[in-house]
């Protein structure tokens, strides 16, 4: 395409079109244009040049000669940059570049038909042999002549869409991720205080076999205030024979704790991810260990925690002959064997995050003395302990394993730990508090 217009850059702002015509008097040009824009001032407006110019010549040969002679030449105190003008072409619409959706489907269908017939799908280079092939690769693996039978068999396995179904990006793999459960729904935008009992009551007409509730953590960054909220969601497995679409349609508009919620069919791969995370969390909680002196305390399942919790209680309370520890889920009673020594300097914190007990050492327990020690043959139902500083606090997380009656303990303030070798102050004016530990269940 022949172009008879040139583009001149770095033109002086003080140069006019008449000055440029005088500069180009040795060439056969037809028009000179210096584009400008209006600068608005307080009292009047001014026209300011863009620093460029366009010159039209009588022929393309004359334009080429002007570019060769004028490029790099000085005009108005500036060195000019001259080149041929490139006409502006707007970008093509997306439909023209890639075709409509129907054209794309037909193009891919052509590859599928040729692959099913055993022939190699035509490429763009085969359709247009004059154009070089750029950025296109055939989906098949083609081996050159002289290959062995094993290599050819390997190529057939790679090309086989059935054996290569698990490859990432294939339709089979994508369909697995988008598979929807037939009995589990995903409930979003639940109230913060939602419990499993609330969800059971909500789905009482359809039955709930399994419920998974999970919550997101708050974002403390003030720049993202829209994320600073508690998002609670749940996966509920229903036992009804109705299809999920029918269940969702019937529950449309029904509120949970006065709040509208969103119910959708759950993806199967999301259900598997939640169950996998729950299993890993349970294993970590089971294997959690806390070192206390020379012994390791392991809190496992609720049945194992009953025996382990007695060892923990014996280490914390000190040298006491026996304490009744009850499991309220069963009638079994475990006795704590006599142990010597006190708790170490490291406070005992949460031992199990889900299933069992939480033991907290508020300070360094002082020496404890027994009152009214019973005979060995007499069953011990209650132990009174005296302490002058701090106390012991055992708290049940879910089903209580250790039962403690704190009603016998008077009000006290938790202060800083005192050194063990510090002399005891006189008991004048000091209140001696009693800690009553009793069993709330009877055997």
UniProtKB/Swiss-Prot annotation:
Keywords: Repeat, RNA-binding, Transcription, Transcription regulation
Domain of life: Eukaryota
Cellular component, GO annotation: cytoplasm; nucleus; ribonucleoprotein complex
Gene Ontology molecular function terms on file: mRNA binding
Sequence ranges of Basic residues compositional bias: 417-427
Residue span, RRM domain: 4-87, 183-268
Pfam families: RRM_1 (PF00076)
TM annotation in the entry: none
InterPro entries: Nucleotide-bd_a/b_plait_sf, RBD_domain_sf, RRM_dom, RRM_dom_euk, Rrt5_RRM1, Rrt5_RRM2, RRT5_SRSF_SR
Ranges annotated as biased composition (Basic and acidic residues): 121-133
Region (Disordered) location: 112-140, 408-443
Main function: May be involved in the modulation of rDNA transcription.
Family: Belongs to the RRT5 family.
Protein name (Swiss-Prot/TrEMBL): Regulator of rDNA transcription protein 5
């Amino acid at each position: 395409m022949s172009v008879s217009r040139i583009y001149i850059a770095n033109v002086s702002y003080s140069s006019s079109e008449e000055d440029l015509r005088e500069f180009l008097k040795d060439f056969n040009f037809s028009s000179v244009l210096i584009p400008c824009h209006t600068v608005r001032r307080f009292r009047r407006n001014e026209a300011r040049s863009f620093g460029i110019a366009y010159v039209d010549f009588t022929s393309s040969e004359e334009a080429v000669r002007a570019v060769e002679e004028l490029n790099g030449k000085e005009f108005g105190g500036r060195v000019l940059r001259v080149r041929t003008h490139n006409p502006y072409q707007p970008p093509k619409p997306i439909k023209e570049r890639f075709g409509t959706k129907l054209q794309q489907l037909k193009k891919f269908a052509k590859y599928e038909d040729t692959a099913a017939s055993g022939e190699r799908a035509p490429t763009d280079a085969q359709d247009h042999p004059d154009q070089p092939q750029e950025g296109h690769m055939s989906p098949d693996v083609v081996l050159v002549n002289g290959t062995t039978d094993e290599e050819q068999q390997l190529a057939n396995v790679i090309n086989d869409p059935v054996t290569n179904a698990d490859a990432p990006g294939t339709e089979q793999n994508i369909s697995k991720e988008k598979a929807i459960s037939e009995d589990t729904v995903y409930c979003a935008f639940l109230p913060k205080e939602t419990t499993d009992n609330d969800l059971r009551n909500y789905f009482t007409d359809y039955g709930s076999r399994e419920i998974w509730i999970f919550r997101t953590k708050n974002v403390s960054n003030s720049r993202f205030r829209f994320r600073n909220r508690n998002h609670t969601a749940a996966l509920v497995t229903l036992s009804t024979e109705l299809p999920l679409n029918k269940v969702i349609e019937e529950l449309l508009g029904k509120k949970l704790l006065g709040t509208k919620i969103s119910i959708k069919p759950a993806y199967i791969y999301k259900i598997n991810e939640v169950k996998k995370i729950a299993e890993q969390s349970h294993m970590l909680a089971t294997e959690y260990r806390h070192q206390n002196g020379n012994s390791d305390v392991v809190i496992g399942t609720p049945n194992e925690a009953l025996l382990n919790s007695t060892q923990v209680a014996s280490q914390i309370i000190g040298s006491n002959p026996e304490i009744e520890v009850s499991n309220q889920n069963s009638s079994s009673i475990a006795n704590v064997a006599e142990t010597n020594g006190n708790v170490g300097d490291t406070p005992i914190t949460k031992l199990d995050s889900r299933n069992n007990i939480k033991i907290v050492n508020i300070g360094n327990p002082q020496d404890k003395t027994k009152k009214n020690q019973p005979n060995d043959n007499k069953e011990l139902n209650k132990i009174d302990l005296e302490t002058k500083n701090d106390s012991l606090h055992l708290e049940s997380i879910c089903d209580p394993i250790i039962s403690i009656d704190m009603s016998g303990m008077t009000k006290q303030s938790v202060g800083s730990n005192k050194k063990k070798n510090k002399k005891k102050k006189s008991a004048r004016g000091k209140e001696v508090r009693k800690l009553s530990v009793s069993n709330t269940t009877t055997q």
